[in-house]
Design a protein with these regions (language model features):
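Short amphipathic alpha-helix with an adjacent loop that forms part of the alpha/beta core around
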Residues: 197-208
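C-terminal hydrophobic helical "lid"/dimerization subdomain
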Residues: 273-324
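Mid-domain Rossmann-like dinucleotide-binding core that forms the NAD(H)/NADP(H) cofactor-binding site
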Residues: 127-195
Length: 324
């Protein structure tokens, strides 16, 4: 099978095309002929050698993420009448940057009719985390939510899902193109993070009380600046760190004094069955036209290094996916 292989830690150039033996389905697995591959910013950081304390990954390795495709073979304990030839998505980590993937059958999510495999791939991870965050923070109709990184793969989904829950949505994005996209997706107000004074503009957009929920997918200084915008008794989620400067630093004394519930990425580590349930919800919403996937660029698998460079360049909106 064809793969994109990280030969050593480093820049995007270390991600090279290679050939590996085709996988064989284990007893409770299927083999998926991959159509499109979901990419995650964290994979660019792992490739660069970061987060070794969280991810036990050593080169050479095939990066992980998610795939969409068609089941081509089934293991001895898998019913081929149910799964053979079926369009599916699945989280595959490591090993998703490949033309074939062996996947446990209980990790599969069928793709409904009317939804393309490219769009389905873009939902493998981000939609699951987005739905989990909204469930975890218990965002309700009539509440106000501040979403940083609102033009990214998960941010674009959060904007739509929060709006669908009846919340008032204030997005934070950088630059006029990204601001326009977030507004188009349904945000009531959008603040341009390119302005050094963006926290003041966000405070004005939120009103005097602040945000009932802050969903910070950026981290670093921007995430830290978003924390004071949380209302008394609100919920603050620090779940993203694409800046390379870590998750948002939250002063515990202030959080306690203002009765703010602080959540992190550890709070959305989900069981396979929970992931499947949330992904099923997301695919159904997308197939019905109620959830739009924003795909900023598509690169062939052989150019995965270029895809990583584009992701790190931060110029694109939405998701970057790989085609096989």
């Amino acid at each position: 099978m064809r793969v994109a292989l990280v030969e050593k830690f480093g820049g995007p150039e270390v991600l090279i095309p290679a050939e590996l033996p085709d996988p064989v389905a284990g007893p409770d697995e299927v083999v998926v002929a991959v159509d499109h591959i979901d990419t995650l910013f964290v994979q660019t950081q792992i490739r660069a050698g970061a987060f070794g304390e969280y991810f036990d990954v050593k080169p050479p390795y095939v990066p992980g993420g998610g795939v969409s495709g068609t089941v081509t073979s089934t293991g001895a304990e898998v019913d081929p009448a149910v799964w053979a030839g079926r369009r599916v998505i699945a989280a595959v980590d490591p090993g998703s940057y490949a033309s074939l993937a062996a996947v446990p059958v209980d990790h599969l999510v069928p793709v409904p009719d009317g939804l393309g495999l490219r769009e389905a791939a873009a939902l493998v991870h981000d939609s699951v985390t987005a739905l989990a965050l909204l469930d975890l923070t218990a965002l309700k109709a009539g509440e106000t939510v501040l979403i940083t990184g609102a033009s990214g793969g998960m941010g674009t989904l959060l904007v739509q899902l929060a709006r669908a829950r009846g919340a008032r949505v204030v997005g934070v994005a950088r630059g006029p193109e990204k601001v326009a996209l977030v507004r188009e997706l349904g945000a009531h107000e959008v603040v341009d993070a390119a302005s050094t004074d963006w926290p003041r503009h966000a405070a004005e957009a939120l009103g005097g009380a602040g945000a009932d929920v802050v969903l910070d997918g950026v981290g670093g200084e921007l995430g830290a600046a978003a924390f004071p915008l949380t209302a008394h008794g609100g919920r603050f989620s620090a779940h993203g760190a694409p800046t390379g400067h870590g998750f948002a630093a939250v002063p515990a004394d202030e959080a306690g004094r203002r009765a703010i519930t602080v959540l992190g990425i550890a709070d959305v580590q989900l069981t396979p069955s929970r992931r499947v349930a949330l992904a099923t919800r997301a695919l159904e919403e997308a197939a019905a036209g109620r959830l739009r996937t924003v795909i900023g660029a598509v690169y062939p698998l052989e150019r995965a290094g270029e895809a990583h460079a584009a992701i790190e360049g931060r110029g694109l909106v939405g998701k970057v996916v790989l085609s096989v």
